Regions:
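Short amphipathic beta-strand starts and helix->beta connectors
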Residues: 92-95, 177-181
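Long, hydrophobic, amphipathic alpha-helical segments used as structural scaffolds
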Residues: 79-84, 178-185
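Catalytic palm active-site di-aspartate
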Residues: 109-113, 155, 159, 180-197
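Right-hand nucleic-acid polymerase module
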Residues: 1-49, 54-110, 115-137, 141-149, ...
Length: 293
């Protein structure tokens, strides 16, 4: 069933003006915010980047902090966000990003360079003050809970939604530019996709996007700015839109599914399996489902 969503003015955090109220909303003991600094702890680890030999560093919160961040996410996730936002939205996934552009014969893809590294603390604070109308001290506490070392860490439950909210004005400006150029726009974290049934000037749109990004302290990853015509296969966040306007599974995902199947193959016919094996089976199911869509 579709999730009932409401305007930001209906969010429980809206116009939260006292720390006592914030403690109640975050399910903390009275006075719990006073000791918040002592539980702000993170650990770092590396994961493989998809379809690349590079590593991605993840900064993740410890258990207690993660639970509070999850509560903030819960309070924000039912707020209505723009239709063009795909990432972090319940009942949407990267497949929907590809599907949104099936009619687009002409496609421009733009990635933001080191997006998370350049997401700073100040726009997060301003989101709470200006959009959620909290008092400055409440905004500061919320910002302390979900930022680290002056930025948005990559491994928090709140990371995706806050990276969007901190720069929602920037993305809205880009959505308006797309509209002016007659393009459909979608956003998946830092991947922006623009498509149209008619030819448009990719250079003109790219220059305008560049200006908006720089205004907010970001810039495009130039090697990843790509323009595709009607006869091209168009890679869009883990999917491929074919010239026949259907969605295909890229070879990378096919290989991932094959490799994952080889790992779980010895388990066929066995009664019990370890928690790790169960996780691998669930992961394989998810990948097959993604490929089917």
């Amino acid at each position: 069933a579709p999730i009932r969503k409401y305007d930001i003015t209906q969010c429980a955090l809206y116009k939260c003006r006292t720390k006592k109220r914030l403690e109640h909303l975050l399910c903390l003991e009275p006075g719990g915010l006073k000791i918040i600094d002592s539980i702000i702890r993170y650990h770092k680890f590396e994961i493989d980047k998809k379809h690349s030999d590079e590593k991605r560093e993840i900064t993740a919160p410890d258990k207690i902090l993660k639970a509070i961040q999850r509560r903030i996410l819960y309070l924000l996730h039912r707020v209505i966000r723009p239709e063009w936002l795909i990432s972090g939205e319940k009942q949407k996934c990267y497949i929907d990003n590809g599907k949104a552009h099936l009619d687009g014969k002409y496609v421009l893809t733009v990635d933001i360079k080191k997006f998370y590294d350049n997401c700073t603390r100040e726009p997060v604070y301003q989101f709470f003050v200006q959009k959620l109308k909290t008092s400055p001290d409440v905004a500061k506490k919320l910002t302390d809970i979900i930022t680290y070392n002056g930025g948005i860490p990559t491994g928090c439950p709140t990371s995706q939604i806050m990276a969007f909210y901190a720069y929602s004005d920037m993305f809205s400006e880009i959505a308006d530019l797309a509209k002016q150029c007659g393009c459909k726009f979608t956003l998946y974290v830092d991947d922006m996709t623009f498509s149209s049934t008619k030819p448009f000037s990719p250079n003109q749109l790219r220059q305008m996007i560049d200006c908006v990004l720089r205004k907010y302290g970001h810039k495009p990853k130039y090697p990843k700015v790509k323009y595709y015509g009607p006869s091209d296969y168009k890679p869009i966040t883990g999917t491929v839109v074919t010239p026949e306007q259907s969605l295909a599974v890229p070879n990378g995902l096919q290989n991932t599914i094959y490799d994952a199947f080889q790992k779980v193959k010895p388990l066929i016919g066995t009664e019990a399996c370890s928690e790790e094996d169960a996780k691998q089976i669930l992961s394989l199911k998810g990948q097959i489902q993604a490929a089917r869509n």
